[in-house]
Amino acid sequence: MEAHIKTNKGTIKLNLFYDQVPLTVSNFVNLANRGYYNNLKFHRVIDDFMIQTGCPLGTGTGGPGYDFEDEFHDSLKHDKPGVLSMANAGPGTNGSQFFITHVETPWLDNNHSIFGQVIDDEDQDVVNSISQNDIIEEISIIGELTQNNEINQRISDWNKILDR
């Protein structure tokens, strides 16, 4: 499964790790498919660290109105550029904000749920070109989620909150 994040600087293509972290990927895919991320800005950009987006307020303080638990997998590490992870305010506070790294960031392991990776160097070049306040135009999801009743119920509950 892939996510194609179309920005004003180009498209970032990412592999999503549904098999390892199905809840985190399902949350992201649901928000993307609803258009939640469309026209949001990259509100936090730190050279030689990461780019962050997903805040509906554009300040880093907003989210979808719900939180969910961290989801870590032993095989997923912040050991290279282009790692896609959830931003959070501490354990169990994942929502809609995410970041993509410029470099390896091992101190983030087991603190931020990794759920994807840029596909190639061209995608990383787009990541590296993003500046503060650049925008996501839209996110396209390529592929289908495996059906999981427990996760489907969580998505249904989240959508009730999002539909308010």
Which residues does each predicted region cover?
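Cyclophilin-like peptidyl-prolyl cis-trans isomerases
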Residues: M1-R164
